[in-house]
Amino acid sequence: WIMGHMVNAIEQVGEFLNLGADAIEFDFDFDKDGIAQVTHHGIPCDCGRKCTKKAIFTEYLDNIRQVTTPDDPKFREQLVLLALDLKLQRISSAKAYRAGEDVAKKLLDHYWQRGNSRARAYILLNIPLVEDYEFIRAFKDTLKNEGYESYNDKVGINFSGNEDLDKIRDVLEILGIHKQVWQADGITSCFARGTERLKEALEKRDTPGYNYINKVYAWTLVRKSIMRRSLRLGVDGVMSNNPDRVIKALKEKEFADKFRLATYNDNPWEKFRG
């Protein structure tokens, strides 16, 4: 999976898909009451990127629904995964539950259209910190209470704040989540990062019987040397400002027989058995 990073304006969706991404990540801000308002990262952000691009959250969802709906004029077959970067660290943890309710209802109304939409993308909820785990509980409670619990099959969880992996496992245990879990590791493209935690995540992913990491991705990679390093370690995904560079790396002799771009037929919640 090649995740286009910080795709927060509607016009950027096509731009990143044209560069080769099969997944996009977008940020969204909440108001003080935990209501999702806009797709927006803000300052600071990655080097060389404009930090202030934005869209109204519901309008963004309406557009991305069309882009991921077969037979729609806007349909792009390659887009199979949406990573929602939840800026929960900007609001009180006490509002995390309310935020989870709101996001679930907005997805029901604007993406899934309560069963009337054929939009097919998988959705990855990126939670910045484990202290905001009530967002996940609220999200799942809302799907159940609204009568659409089946959509849980399309939704995965990722804690993206580089926290202790055992601490993350403990929170997933509290929530009763033992599947559909990604683990991110990374840092803004402005800085270098070692591989110790990334290797630990990959080791846990590959441990038989360990159910708290199904996939691992590295972010935000812009240098080909770092992309190659991550591929050699065996990541499932790469988040990048430059998807075209990842595409070129995948075509190199070292990787061409080991990796390919994920499609809709690849389940993002299953561990890869090579």
From Swiss-Prot:
It is an enzyme of class 4 (lyase). Keywords: Cytolysis, Dermonecrotic toxin, Disulfide bond, Hemolysis, Lipid degradation, Lipid metabolism, Lyase, Magnesium, Metal-binding, Secreted, Toxin. Its cofactor is Mg(2+). Disulfide bonds join C45-C51, C47-C190. InterPro entries: PLC-like_Pdiesterase_TIM-brl. One of its GO terms (cellular component) is extracellular region. Its main location: secreted. It catalyses: an N-(acyl)-sphingosylphosphocholine = an N-(acyl)-sphingosyl-1,3-cyclic phosphate + choline; an N-(acyl)-sphingosylphosphoethanolamine = an N-(acyl)-sphingosyl-1,3-cyclic phosphate + ethanolamine; a 1-acyl-sn-glycero-3-phosphocholine = a 1-acyl-sn-glycero-2,3-cyclic phosphate + choline; a 1-acyl-sn-glycero-3-phosphoethanolamine = a 1-acyl-sn-glycero-2,3-cyclic phosphate + ethanolamine. GO terms for molecular function: lyase activity; metal ion binding; phosphoric diester hydrolase activity; toxin activity. The active site is at H5, H41 (nucleophile). It is found in: Secreted. Binds 1 Mg(2+) ion per subunit. Expressed by the venom gland. Belongs to the arthropod phospholipase D family. Class II subfamily. Dermonecrotic toxins cleave the phosphodiester linkage between the phosphate and headgroup of certain phospholipids (sphingolipid and lysolipid substrates), forming an alcohol (often choline) and a cyclic phosphate. This toxin acts on sphingomyelin (SM). It may also act on ceramide phosphoethanolamine (CPE), lysophosphatidylcholine (LPC) and lysophosphatidylethanolamine (LPE), but not on lysophosphatidylserine (LPS), and lysophosphatidylglycerol (LPG). It acts by transphosphatidylation, releasing exclusively cyclic phosphate products as second products. This is Dermonecrotic toxin SdSicTox-betaIIB1bv.
